[in-house]
Every structure is written in C-alpha cells, then in structure tokens.
Amino acid sequence: RKNIIKKLKDIIIGQDDEIDQLVTEIFRLQNNQNGKNKGILLSGSTGVGKSRICTLLAKYLDIPCKIIDTTQLTMPGYRGQNIEDFLEQLYLDERKNLKRVEKAIIVFDEVDKKGSRDNYDVSGKGVLNQLLKFLDGTEYTIGLNEESVLQKTKVRISTNNMIVIFSGAFSNVYNAPKFTTNNLGFRETNAPKSKEPTLQDFIDIGCLPDESMGRLPIIIHLNTLSENDLKNILLHSKESDIYYVKQEFKNEAEADIKFSDEAIEEIAHQAYLLQTGARSLQKIVHDATYHAFKKVTDDFGKYSKVIITKDTITDHKNYTLIPKEQNKVLQKNKKML
C-alpha cells in the first residue's frame, strides 16, 4: 500500500492526504467480505486529478477501471447508452475475463450534473436510482453478438465485489456560503478549511437522491489547486508536461530545452487564472513551445538548445536558440577556465 501511495504522489501533486485516504479506503473495501458500505463519493473541481487518480490506482492494483460519463446514461427505452452497454465494453476490453470485470473499479463521473436541478427530471432521477442499485450489488445481463452463432450470447455480470465511486465537482455544494473560504468560492490547499459537507448536504444542495443516505459513507474532497501547486506539477510531477516536451525536443530535434524560473511561474500563473486545474498546463506549454519546436525540427541538427523565458509564454515567437557550434565554443571556454 505504501508503495502505491508513493507512486501516486509522484504524479498527482497537491493531494497528499486525499491520496492516503483514498488508497486506504480502497484497500479496506477490497478486504470487505460483507459487501456493505462500498460506495465512495469523490469530489473536486475540474482538473484536480479525480479520474487520473482512479485510473492510476487501478493500474497499480492490476484491476480494471471503467470511467462512465453519467451524463450520457439513460434509462432503458430512452435514446442513449445504459449501464449494460458500458459493462459490455468493459467485458470486451478485458477479453471476456469475467473474474477481472467483477473486481473492477467503476467510476460514475459527473454524477452531480445528472442530479443537477436542470437535469433532475424523470430520466435523471431514474438513472441515479439505477446507480444506487448498482452500488448495492446486483446482476446485469449483457448480450454479445457472436460471429459463429445467429443469436446473442448472454453473460451475467455481478456488481457485488466492484468498487463504486461517484465522482463530480459538486460546485453547488462547495460554493455554498457555509463551505467557501473566500469570495471567489475556491479553496486553496494552504487555506484554512471550513466544515466539510456531509452526505446530507450533498442530498440537500447537490441533488443526490434521498436514497443515497447510508450508501456513500466515504466522502473524499480533492483540493482545488493553488498557483504553487501548478508550479510544483510542472517541476516535480512524473507526468509534467515540461518533462514530455524535453523528451520531445531531444528525440525529434536532438536539442535541449530550458525553461527559466520566471517562465515556470508564468505558466502556473496563466493556468491558475483559467481555473481549470492542471488541464490547462498542457495547452500553455504546447503553445509556448510550438514555434521553437517547428524551428529546430525544420533546421534539424543546427541548434543544441532552446531557452524559454517569461516573455515566451505571452509571445510564443520570443525564444532563444543556441547553435551547436556556439555551444561547443562555450563548453570549450568553460573547460579552459
């Protein structure tokens, strides 16, 4: 367990306590033999890592993970996809290994949107009640089209031993006056936390059905990322976009790329202003390096280094190139000194 926690923290920044709690709860649920109290409510704003944590955790545990967009779920008889469709996809993805499928982590993502007042119609309420049935443990029958036979092959899939996570931003809950810590409604990791919402608050404010009470005993809220968190993601995460860009320049142009400290700070600042968490980092880094990448690949072998400064983040053509010959002279002079 400690090894898995460390691996997650090497990638996901700003959620140390929350990772500890989630991994511990998952281990407890896996060892739970009575099939009760296995629902987790995982909340957090856009881009804080809800889906990524779940997929990585499943990878490290060597179990399947299926993330289902709850907004796309419909009741039988309505146009759209139902739970059986997603279970069929999972079954085929796992090469029809039923034992693995029935041990999977199932994430019902954006469940708050399905339960919002705008969508809380007969269909929306029906879908949420279906999810609670899924959580309680039931069986679904999926039909597979087999090439060798004219009729569908029926497969029964039990959810009794699946780990079920309800995921969403639930911004209407966390932006409620009694839970906000500043006038913007965002909570930074270094800000003092007010009282945490209870499941009753999610029912009253977040439009979860009353039947949720008692079924989601574990509530984990991922922190909204601060500007410093975003900077640390760039500098320290093993999935940092800067790391990938450095590899790209090295592999495709045989050139090093260096970001000044001020450039890192500006990228984090621009991403923070967008309030979409870590998701915006990739686009900002990509846009800031696009013209430099095009130049060094067009003139392959000519340049040894690219320097990205704070000015490059706002003016993407404003970067510095170090030719290979000049770099050789600089290295020679250093040795002489």
Protein language model regions, located:
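AAA+ P-loop NTPase nucleotide-binding core of proteostasis motors
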Residues: 1-337
